[in-house]
Curated annotation (Swiss-Prot):
This is N-acetylneuraminate lyase. Belongs to the DapA family. NanA subfamily. Its EC number is 4.1.3.3. The active site is at Y137, K165. The lineage of its organism: Bacteria, Pseudomonadati, Pseudomonadota, Gammaproteobacteria, Enterobacterales. GO terms for biological process: carbohydrate metabolic process; N-acetylneuraminate catabolic process.
Amino acid sequence: MAKQLRGVMAALLTPFNTQQALDKESLRRLVQFNMQQGIDGLYVGGSTGEAFVQSLSEREQVLEIVAEEAKGKITLIAHVGCVSTAESQQLAASASRFGFDAVSAVTPFYYPFSFEEHCDHYRAIIDSADGLPMVVYNIPALSGVKLTLDQINTLVTLPGVGALKQTSGDLFQMEQIRRAHPDLVLYNGYDEIFASGLLAGADGGIGSTYNIMGWRYQAIAKAIREGDNATAQRLQSECNKVIDLLIKVGVFRGLKTVLHYMDVVSVPLCRKPFAPVAEPYLPELKALAKQLMVEKA
């Protein structure tokens, strides 16, 4: 299972229609598009997937549709994290039923939970996942939960934990985690430091921009494996030029707009309160979509 979890995993977006409802057909196309790019797996229902502006039922629908499209073809990780332990457990049970390979959960947020409460939260989810390994999701910039290195070391050694998604710019901490846990599956979470994360000890990555240029990240990983750091750095720079634009326009809405111009997503909208991409940026995103489609071909 550890080998199966390693690799380049796209953090899947969730398409919506003009009425803000789940766009199931676009979701299916997006799954297929990612598989065509040679992605090793999908991380479903996380931050990129706008999980926290969806109902529990919608999140289950997304998991089911993705499993129908991709189960057995690539690795599937279901993000099931909620503030509520019971809701997280429900999603974990659904992920197991749908045939996912692992579950993941962000640290519970908003309320100032104690570290032991965090540990109990993860234990309960693991108990509901019917044997699926847990990918602990550490993203302090969004969760507001700033785990110490000792706390991370404790979480990743809980029974049932198989991996850590480390969405932090702290590469020193990444290396410290790898040094302490040589067999842990460790994901880099920030796309803009993917190459650096691999050099610091990550086995692979989970990222949002993989949806539109997954082949670039696969090429970076290959270059690192082969010791060609110059190529990895050049490719990372090319990825970061795209990321610069996406940050300027809004990452999730920018990605959906690019995918719309690629004829993958019908409607380039995130769920409110996210706003659409500002009109002056559309020509740049259209040009980017064209460039990437030529490169992909």
